[in-house]
Amino acid sequence: MTAQVDRKHLMTSVEMAHFVSHGAIAFEGVVPDELNRRAIDVLDAGIDPVPYGTPLDVAFPEGTFVRELIDLPVVAGAIQSLVGPNPHIDHHAVHVRPPRGGEAQNMHGDAILDTRRDAFDAQLMYYPREVTLEQGGTLSVPGTHLRRINQTGIGRYQNLAGQTRLTCPAGTVVLLHHGIWHGGRRNDSDVPRYMFKIRFNPSVRQLRLWNTDDIDSDGVRRELTRQFGWTNANEGRLELVNRAKLWRTLTGDENFDIDYYLTRETLRPQFIAPGATDVRLGASHAANGWGH
């Protein structure tokens, strides 16, 4: 992963805009069947933990199963597009739900008082087998990743507007913003459900890490203005502001806006008008010669 990924395998600007609005992006069925079959034995045996902040190349050396997975071009390209070429491993975990077993998790976000607004972690979720509704695919609420919560602070809420349940074919990889609201479901099927998660920390500034050839595409704005079941008129406008702020951070374009929201926030003129009623204020020097 230390090597730069070929540009053709990086995410596009439209895909990045989708991630910014949804808080997730899925790559369905991209892992080869042979790797999916091997994954079951690997996950059953468990994968040794690593200390927080371990460089990727140290955590998953070449020749390991996980390295083979994340070196797949589409997966490597997505990781680099989100967190850069040399991310660190925050942590990883194997999640296996037995048949007819487990309990549904409360809704939560994988972040405790994470105040970063100019960076984010990416979480990879790999599903080596098909996930059906009966198997209890991960529940999430698209677009909630920019609404800051303290991990399980929303756990008492159920059946949120706009929530979705993941179903996917074998070999699917999903990448999430660390702040998205989600929760695992119980498995009501007769087969175990497998998922492997890795959380990546960026080690470089997250600035135009993807393929920006289509950055002026109309599709970018369409993705950034997507609405969900919970984004009514009031909440929807606030979410457009949140997305525009993140897009400015990711692109370095400090003039980008959706509608006029962020531009309006900058309207704080310092020029004192001629004839200000409080003589203690004086007038800006540039007003001299205006008359009256």
Mark where each language-model region is:
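Non-heme Fe(II)-dependent double-stranded beta-helix
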Residues: 1-116
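Short hydrophobic-aromatic micro-motifs
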Residues: 26-27, 126, 174-176
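A structural signal for short, well-ordered beta-strand segments
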Residues: 92-94, 124-126, 196-200
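Catalytic core of non-heme Fe(II) oxygenases with the double-stranded beta-helix
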Residues: 103-167, 205-214
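Short, solvent-exposed loop/turn segments at secondary-structure junctions
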Residues: 148, 182-184
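Non-heme Fe(II)/2-oxoglutarate
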Residues: 185-292
